[in-house]
Swiss-Prot record:
GO terms for molecular function: ATP binding; ATP-dependent protein folding chaperone. This is Chaperone protein DnaK. It comes from the Bacteria. It comes from Megasphaera elsdenii. InterPro entries: ATPase_NBD (IPR043129), Heat_shock_70_CS (IPR018181), HSP70_peptide-bd_sf (IPR029047), Hsp_70_fam (IPR013126).
Length: 450
């Protein structure tokens, strides 16, 4: 039986892993790295580049390079490259194809099945888009697993022991926090919260804005209008952010960043960790509210949380770690690799599905409530958020006026009170309702989530 791979399809980087001899193994790509940048580029001749090769040519070819496409999954968004339009699913499929090929060259056999992870807070449309990307890449996606849950699987299988775990996952573009209870091989998610548009990219952008502002003060030149300079600034901002996790000050030096009538201009700035913290303080604070909400929804007290697992590259930021510590009063566990544990968890779940991993049961939850629009534009919830899945719930509705021949069923997902403030999943019309006074016909609506 061919292997099922586990894929962490990330905003910034992606990772692929597989179960070998009962142990999860992270697969090294053809460039010799365990991380593959989630970047796609097209050369001037139209050749497609994915991963490190695409990232390397981004500065000289910014208009034909796409990064952070994950932030647009589930949206009606297209990228125009060399006169051709691509959907987020198609770009993501190119990244998945590269991971699939790397896995095949490592394993020496064809790979056709995968488990792919997504942010816990992804809605149904974003999850479906991820499945579609897998299909385009030639992969049968056996299961979509929430990233924090996958990280907890990796931690639990490696470290063992029972307890209540908080997984804090701050990646390149998304943020999730999940509370799980581990016991006797059962991984039960109690609550989840997050923000699908908060991550390392936003920290980079704050640094970039500061660099552009400082350079403008010094030279009067606005670099935000220069595509090529902007790509160099983005790379320098990311590098500075990473360095400031281990040092208190870093130098940002970009020679020949631009030129004017007086000649070439160089950017040379010093960014301290204190200044970085000041620039990004609102982003750090934005992770705290969902964390508090997830703890409250889990039914546990802060003192009952036994372990904190940090996932995602941005969780290495010292100010982020300090903020978590200030809420929970304990040091986060350093026992997992924040870049690799999600893919490892996906590989473990793949192992569970094909029977390679025994005595592990994963009980996840739905992150957003599922329901329909009722009279007055109200969102009536049928399945509440944080309900353990798989699940099935039914509710009986009726007509609003006498002799109503049909009902428009508007299916939504979200957490707001009014239908207009939530995400539409679909609409359908139920016709052929027998003539009767309002309130008499009984219409049963059933939702299944698997």
């Amino acid at each position: 039986m061919s292997k099922v791979i586990g894929i962490d399809l990330g905003t910034t980087n992606s990772v692929v892993a597989v179960m070998e001899g009962g142990e999860p193994t992270v697969i090294t790509n053809t460039e010799g790295s365990r991380l593959t940048p989630s970047v796609v580029g097209f050369s001037k001749t139209g050749e497609r580049l994915v991963g490190q090769l695409a990232k390397r040519q981004a500065v000289s070819n910014p208009e034909n390079t796409i990064s952070s496409i994950k932030r647009h999954m589930g949206e009606s968004y297209t990228v125009d490259i060399q006169g051709k339009k691509y959907t987020p699913q198609e770009i993501s499929a190119m990244i998945l194809q590269k991971l699939k090929e790397d896995a095949e060259s490592y394993l020496g056999e064809k790979v056709t099945q995968a488990v792919i992870t997504v942010p816990a807070y992804f809605n149904d449309g974003q999850r479906q888009a991820t499945k579609d990307a897998g299909k385009i890449a030639g992969l049968d996606v056996l299961r979509i697993v929430n990233e924090p849950t996958a990280a907890a699987l990796a931690y639990g299988l490696d470290k063992g022991g029972d307890g209540k775990i908080l997984v804090f996952d701050l990646g390149g573009g998304t943020f999730d926090v999940s509370i799980l209870e581990l016991g006797d091989g059962v991984f039960e998610v109690k609550a989840t919260n997050g923000n699908t548009h908060l991550g390392g990219d936003d920290f980079d952008n704050k640094v970039m804005e500061w660099m552009i502002s400082e350079f403008k003060k010094e030279t009067g030149i606005d670099l935000s209008q220069d595509k090529m300079a902007e790509q160099r600034l983005k790379e320098a901002a990311e590098k500075a952010k990473i360095e400031l996790s281990t040092v208190l000050s870093t130098n940002i030096n970009l020679p020949f960043i631009t030129a004017d009538a007086t000649g070439p201009k160089h950017l040379d700035l010093t960014l301290t960790r204190a200044k970085f913290n000041e620039l990004t303080e609102d982003l750090v604070q934005a992770t705290m509210e969902p964390t508090k909400k997830a703890i409250a929804d889990s039914g546990f007290t802060i003192d009952e949380i036994d372990k904190i697992i940090l996932v995602g590259g941005s969780s290495r930021i010292p100010a982020v770690q300090e903020a978590i510590k200030s809420i929970l009063g304990k040091e986060p566990s350093k026992g997992v690799n924040p870049d690799e544990c999600v893919a490892i968890g996906a590989a473990i779940q793949a192992g569970v599905l094909v029977g390679d991993v025994k005595d592990v049961l994963l009980l996840d939850v739905t992150p957003l409530s599922l329901g329909i629009e009722t009279l007055g534009g109200v969102f009536t919830k049928i399945i509440d958020r944080n309900t353990t899945i798989p699940t099935s719930r039914s509710q009986v509705f009726s007509t609003a006026v006498d002799n109503q021949p049909s009902v428009d069923v508007h299916v939504l997902q979200g957490r707001r009170e009014m239908a207009a403030d939530n995400k539409t999943l679909g609409r359908f019309e139920l016709t052929g309702i027998p003539a009767a006074p309002r309130g008499v016909p009984r219409i049963e609506v059933t939702f299944n989530i698997d």
